[in-house]
Amino acid sequence: MSPPVASRVGVGVIVTRADGNLLLGYRIKAGETPSWCLPGGHVEPGETFETAALRELREETGIVTQRPADIFAILQQLTARHTAITGAAQVSLEDNLAEPQVTEPDVFARWAWFPQAALPTPLFPASDAVLSLWQSAPCPERWRAYSVL
């Protein structure tokens, strides 16, 4: 008998400042290859993608904003081990004042702002997929995107 297939629903949040730079965290979670990652995480039961995006932003970075989280796509990771659905969100901050904090030192070593044309590598797979779609590039292999109109 094959093992049960797990499903996961998450959200990835592109956070941009007034100067156009976007926020990425250096992810150092045990058992994973270190990579750069958007704020994000699991959607809790009964929670919308928008609510999850703002909650994860607050929990992971300490950034609290009244700006809306706009969902622009739903992405599906196509693997044999599990089904992963990621809501792609964007939050546009009004200024350049937000200073992210490392609130989960077992997951992130640091947060930094990057120009869109100079993103660091490697990117966390889900973040790579969200950013590719946002930049009008093809989705990475084993990902499928569904635009939200």
Predicted regions and their residues:
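Anionic group-transfer/hydrolysis microenvironments
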Residues: 14, 28-29, 117
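Unchanged
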Residues: 43-67, 76-133, 149
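Conserved Nudix-box catalytic region and its N-terminal flanking loop in Nudix hydrolases
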Residues: 21-59
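Acidic/histidine-enriched, glycine/proline-rich intrinsically disordered or flexible terminal extensions
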Residues: 136-149
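Short, flexible, glycine/charge-rich loop motifs used to bind or transfer phosphoryl groups or to couple energy/partner
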Residues: 2-4, 26, 78, 101-102
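Residue-level preference for beta-strand/loop junctions
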Residues: 7, 34, 83-85
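Conserved N-terminal beta-strand and adjoining loop/helix that marks the start
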Residues: 1-22, 42, 74, 87-92
